[in-house]
Amino acid sequence: MYKNPIKANLGEEVNNSLNYKDVSILSNFVNEQGKILPRRLTGLKSKQQKKVTKLIKQARIAALLPFVIGKN
């Protein structure tokens, strides 16, 4: 149905009680370099994208997600 698998099933999870400790879900919104994916790739609505961005930043500060991935 969707070309991008992220668009298919993560929109509902963002609406539910998602918090910064759900690293397995939040890592789906981060690329291989550790950058937050844009809305056009995630398929989220504006309010959902802002929530995910805020939670990813909180998880980074809490050292649950890295700021940069794979940099030598």
From Swiss-Prot:
The keyword DNA repair does not apply. GO terms for cellular component: chloroplast; mitochondrial small ribosomal subunit. InterPro entries: Ribosomal_bS18, Ribosomal_bS18_CS, Ribosomal_bS18_sf. Its main location: plastid. It comes from the Eukaryota. Keywords: Chloroplast, Plastid, Ribonucleoprotein, Ribosomal protein, RNA-binding, rRNA-binding. GO terms for biological process: translation. Part of the 30S ribosomal subunit. Belongs to the bacterial ribosomal protein bS18 family. This is Small ribosomal subunit protein bS18c.
